Amino acid sequence: QRQMCIRDREYVEAGRDMAESEIAAKFLQDAGYDMLNCDNGTYDAWYWAHPPVYMPENCNLAEVEHIKKFVDIPVVCAGRMTLDAAAEAIAAGRLDGAGFARNFLADPEWFTKVLEDREDDIRPCILCHNGCFNMCHYKGVPNDQDLSDSLHLARCAVNAEMMQWDKHYIKKTNDPKTVHIVGGGIGGMEAARVLTLRGHKPIIYEKSGVLGGTFIAASSESYKGKLRDLLTWYRREMEKLGVEVRLNTEVK
């Protein structure tokens, strides 16, 4: 954490440094902790513990590996961890475990698909915080909330069913219809996906030559690879489900 720098005043660092964290880790171990789940974040720098798309992959790994040297209990790292980096660090003994959470919000079958070598089928988390943070009703301390309210902390922008199963769920129809969808962006493709799973026949009309809509431009920055992964996933879903897509077709 850094204090605000005001013009003509000396700039100073504030917050816990690594030396203090080394002592704190040993103190917690001596106090009886069974495991340490570590990251660089604080309440004032939450984005280290819950990295958005702007943060690099494995952004906490080096510091957590360092902390492990000072304790004998298991040490776990989370925060935009990749499976390869986690597996390599654990195999080398520099880490005892890795934490993954948002992956399961976006796709509850995430790790099952990894084990079955079906990674192309995984609906990716796009690290947007629009569901798991912005849609929640968090008031500061979960214990001060009704359980029914705090449950909303686990929503997901790319998975409408997550923690809203009584509201958003896919049920087979007894009255199949042909549904014409104007626009092949993310919304159009999601509508087509759900309609197909329900037993309807959607037809997408897209005036350009490619599916994606404005999400193509929105995902164009170099650091937004996860957004491009979501586009790839949706396009693949359209092919897998056999959705009829009419490109270069404008509906007036």
State what each model feature region is.
Residues 1-182, 186, 190-202, 210:
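Flavin-dependent oxidoreductase catalytic cores
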Residues 181-248:
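Beta1-alpha1 glycine-rich phosphate/pyrophosphate-binding loop at the start
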Residues 86, 234, 252:
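Acidic, amphipathic alpha-helical patches
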Residues 161-166, 243-249:
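Short gly/ser/thr-rich secondary-structure transition/capping motifs
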